[in-house]
Regions:
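A short beta-strand micro-motif
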Residues: 2-13
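Sequence-level detector for tyrosine residue identity
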Residues: 4-5, 33, 50, 62
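A subset of signal/propeptide-processing and intrinsically disordered low-complexity segments
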Residues: 12, 18, 53-57
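Acidic, low-complexity, intrinsically disordered interaction modules
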Residues: 13-48
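Short, mixed-charge low-complexity intrinsically disordered segments
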Residues: 38-65
Length: 65
């Protein structure tokens, strides 16, 4: 698992900080970051989606147990 620390822009001067625990993330053509986890059978399921144009990934902490 990894910790993803995000800053999401909500309005012109409003942001909020988010921490997501996930195995990985993908960038999609539809304009979102998709954060995902794998189950015991290696099936992927979505944990969260955030719009790429309004999301800053500030840091990633790898290998968190």
């Amino acid at each position: 698992m990894n910790n993803y620390y995000l800053r999401v822009i909500v309005g012109a001067s409003t942001t909020f900080d988010v921490t997501i625990v996930a195995d990985g993330f993908s960038m999609h053509d539809c304009g979102v970051y998709q954060f995902w986890q794998k189950d015991d059978n290696d099936r992927i399921f979505t944990v969260a989606n955030y719009p790429i144009e309004r999301t800053i990934i500030e840091s990633i902490e790898y290998g968190v147990e």
